Amino acid sequence: MKTRLVSITFVLFTSLVLVAQDQYTKGMTKAMSLWGEGKIIEASNLFERIALAEEDNWIPYYYVAQVNTTSSFGEKDVKKLTRQLDKAKEFVAIAQRISPDNPELLVQEAMINTAWMAFDGATYGPVLAGKNTQIYNKALKLAPENPRVVYSKASWDMGSARYFGKDTAPYCADVERALQLFATFESELPFYPSWGEEQAKKELEQCKG
């Protein structure tokens, strides 16, 4: 009888886990679809609801940050920009508490800083440029074979080199290496970040052009 009760409990627990996983997959897929359709607010809100239900999973928190960061590039309304980047910073900080020393989250943190500098380089560049260099160096030390880390650091270094009138050739080689890493990089985590390859290809074309 005891064995039977244990078996029933295990089956019920397994069923609940599978249902939860299925809900997570459906929710994340829907949020990704909304994002792809350009429905930024709806996508962000859905990622946020998923994140609050997945307290030990850094990935939905990451996407709240990423959606709000990427939509901030080119934004002219300072109030909207501040609202989006503050939310991005809040959620990437939570994700970093869940998954410390995560290179993907470090890259996302640097992207938030870059969005501020893209908005007002004179104001934010002196404050955030050095921080970004430190962040990318840390990310590369943690994950030298991660293509997003290699590409993002190379892109950052290339931009800095152009600004100071220095040779960008070494960083073009890093972009090429990133593309090689993209070809083989895999993760078993569902919805693990996968962006960067197309951006790296465009960056490499500029190097050769």
Where are the model-predicted features located?
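Terminal, low-structured helical/coil segments at or just beyond the last alpha-helical repeat
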Residues: A169-G209
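TPR/TPR-like (Sel1-like) alpha-helical repeat modules
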Residues: R83-E90, P126-N137, P147, G165-E186
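Short coil/turn linking the two alpha-helices of tandem helical-hairpin repeats
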Residues: T70-K79, A110, A115-Y124, G159-G165, ...
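Bacterial Sec-dependent N-terminal signal peptides
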Residues: M1-G27
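Start-of-domain marker
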Residues: Q21-T69, K76
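Structural register within alpha-helical repeat arrays
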Residues: K30, V64, S71, E109, ...
